[in-house]
Amino acid sequence: MFKRLIGIAALALSFTALAQPQPTVVDLPTRPGVTQRMLVITPPEPKAAVVLLAGGHGGLQIFPNGSFKWGEGNFLVRSRQLFADKGLMTVVVDAPSDRQRAPFLHGFRQTAEHVTDLQATIAWLKTTAKVPVWLVGTSRGTQS
């Protein structure tokens, strides 16, 4: 009987894992010759979208498989699935392709180019999900 209960519990957990939306990596053209890499988690029927802006230097260096070279411990980055679990399309943005080396976003967050990159991200979300878009930043991410 106990083995059967364990089997049922394991099966239920596997279905729960399958039900979670899988993250995808999107490279969005934002400026001539520049792309914005984003990790996107899209739940079924999102209520809104959140753009998560990590603090620090902002160079997450998201790999094509969705892993990070830096920032995995950042509060927003590590909480990304919690946002998606609440029905929010969740987007973790990296530094753009022309800022993938130190100093990454240092001194860049206040520029017109950064605004252009974020505007392109917001426009893509509004077109893709057709939901309200919220920007969420911590520490230096709030400068964006």
Segments predicted by a language model, with ranges:
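Short, surface-exposed "cap/lid" segments of acyl-processing enzymes
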Residues: P43-L88
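Alpha/beta-hydrolase active-site loop
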Residues: F75, R101-T128
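Residue in the alpha/beta-hydrolase core beta-strand immediately N-terminal to the catalytic nucleophile
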Residues: P132-W134
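Gly/Ala-rich beta-loop-alpha elbow adjacent to hydrolase catalytic centers
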Residues: V136-T142
